[in-house]
Amino acid sequence: MISKINFVKMHGLGNDFVIVNKRDLSSSYDLSQLAKNMAERHTGIGCDQFIIYEEHNDFYEMIIYNIDGSSAKLCGNATRCLAKLIYLDTGKQDITVMVGNKKLLCNVNDENNISVNVGSVSFNEAWMPSRDKVWEFAERYMIDLKETICVDIGNPHVVIFSKLEPQDQKIVGERLQAKELFADGVNVNFAEVKDNKIYLSVWERGAGLTLACGSGACGSFAAGLKRGFIHSPSTIVFKHGNLTMKEENGNIIMQGAATLVARGEYYCEQ
């Protein structure tokens, strides 16, 4: 039997998503497998992450799947994309998005300028290994991590203030998934600071190197502030565009564009 699923394809600075309203999904779907199928770039729609959303009385719930079918706890670019989609479909400008227990306050200033208040970050969580353990691991694999800091933005990130070539970023990103360091994996950010801007590349757990990462931008901005490398406001620079970042009363606010690519129908065999 073949069923039809309405979808929207969007991207935030090249970080792309397939977005589906939960009401269009049958309860019989294996969502993890559906995510893998739709995310496949040759036989599916193609995306970095698969997003399901559901409207409630005063907020929208967002569920995030990686291309390997695993779940993710946060995605800043997907949040901006979902906020824009809701704005286009309903006209709402102030939108609350819930991802698990994380509340994200969104404002659509205009179609190309969406801000997301992601709240506070933490530099002291149980999942974070000691600095000595990270350095010991780095030396074993001959990885030059230079200035490194862990940050929790609702999902786990490690920020490496070091310039590495893409092939080396891939190696480091994969090796830092070692269970002895990060039991559930970690998002790895490669940050280079120039003139109060952070030039950022991100290796996302469950996805690999992506063109942009909103939560990585937030975590790297917070880490840069903590280390004194930058001041607020600042700019995060990705290959296909920038995000403006600022800190207000301990909260991190991300601002940038989101792009609607297509609306369509996906045909699914059950």
Swiss-Prot record:
Its main location: cytoplasm. It comes from the Bacteria. The active site is at C75, C213. It is found in: Cytoplasm. The record marks H157, E204 as: Could be important to modulate the pK values of the two catalytic cysteine residues. Substrate binds at N15, Q49, N66, G76, N77, N155, N187, E204, R205, G214, S215. Its EC number is 5.1.1.7. Signal peptide: none annotated. The keyword Nucleotide-binding does not apply. Transmembrane segments: none annotated. One of its GO terms (biological process) is lysine biosynthetic process via diaminopimelate. One of its GO terms (cellular component) is cytosol. Pfam families: DAP_epimerase. Pathway: Amino-acid biosynthesis; L-lysine biosynthesis via DAP pathway; DL-2,6-diaminopimelate from LL-2,6-diaminopimelate: step 1/1. InterPro entries: DAP_epimerase_AS (IPR018510), DAP_epimerase_DapF (IPR001653). Belongs to the diaminopimelate epimerase family. Catalyzes the stereoinversion of LL-2,6-diaminopimelate (L,L-DAP) to meso-diaminopimelate (meso-DAP), a precursor of L-lysine and an essential component of the bacterial peptidoglycan. Homodimer. This is Diaminopimelate epimerase. It comes from Rickettsia peacockii (strain Rustic). The lineage of its organism: Bacteria, Pseudomonadati, Pseudomonadota, Alphaproteobacteria, Rickettsiales.
